[in-house]
From Swiss-Prot:
PANTHER family: DNA REPAIR PROTEIN RECO (PTHR33991:SF1). Belongs to the RecO family. It holds the Pfam family RecO_C. GO terms for biological process: DNA recombination; double-strand break repair. Monomer. Involved in DNA repair and RecF pathway recombination. GO terms for cellular component: bacterial nucleoid. This is DNA repair protein RecO. NCBIfam families: reco (TIGR00613).
């Protein structure tokens, strides 16, 4: 890919004494693995640019699975994430690294990612709504189509007051039993509209996306979730002291 394209670094690690191995998400080519030669050297002007959450323009070349970065420019400063929003950003980066195949184009998902990072950078409250919207968008781009508006059993529109059980690849069915796999009609409408006005609908959305993403993630836990769990007790203690 010789032309310039927009991209974000999802993850980087040292590769030899002076180079970096990058996992990047690009607008035109999707997820790509790149070697940034010399990026770790003291004289390199790339080191500061090749950071997560920094909007980039880059060019690369190569025919194998690992391409060679030819040039990269930061379009702007890194989007300002810190504390809980930083961990949230690391979570969506890891999510993309785990579920996307290399060199599969997801142009619309690229902008969903950008919108999510911008929402996280601009939030003064909980990052949860932005995360749930991104997870739902990701599932849609992966082909995980779910009808939130109609009961799969009867074909009727869901009722706010009724309970529905989710069956993978089949949809939601009316249920008289309430457990972790059931959702109210109100929850389903919130999922369809991507609007979560209260804690109850946010929790329901999180339950659903965890359930739906599990087949893509397998049994290996996400490292970012563990980091987030370690961060939350510290944050709670600090809030109590304040």
């Amino acid at each position: 890919m010789e032309g310039w394209q927009r991209a974000f670094v999802l993850h980087s690690r040292p590769w030899s004494e002076t180079s970096l191995m990058l996992d990047v998400f690009t607008e035109e080519s999707g997820r790509v693995r790149l070697v940034a030669k010399g990026a770790r050297s003291k004289r390199s002007n790339l080191k500061g640019a090749l950071q997560p959450f920094t909007p980039l323009l880059l060019r690369y070349s190569g025919r194998g699975e690992v391409k060679t970065l030819r040039s990269a420019e930061a379009v702007s400063l890194a989007l300002p994430l810190s504390g809980i929003t930083l961990y949230s950003g690391l979570y969506i980066n890891e999510l993309l690294s785990r579920v996307l195949e290399y060199e599969t184009r997801f142009s619309e998902l690229f902008f969903d990612y950008l919108n999510c990072i911008q929402a996280l950078a601009g939030t003064t409250g909980s990052p949860e709504p932005a995360l749930r919207r991104f997870e739902l968008a990701l599932l849609g781009h992966l082909g995980y189509g779910v009808n939130f508006t109609h009961c799969a059993g009867s074909g009727e529109r869901v009722d706010d007051t009724m309970t529905y059980r989710y069956r993978e690849e089949k949809g939601f069915f009316a249920s008289v039993v309430i457990d972790n796999n059931t959702f109210t009609g109100r929850h389903l409408k919130a999922l369809e509209e991507r609007e979560f006005p209260d804690v109850d609908t946010l929790r329901a959305a999180k339950r659903f996306t965890r359930m739906a993403l599990k087949p893509y993630l397998g049994g290996k836990p996400l490292k970012s979730r563990e980091l987030f769990r370690q961060f939350m007790p510290k944050r709670t203690v600090k809030m109590k002291k304040d």
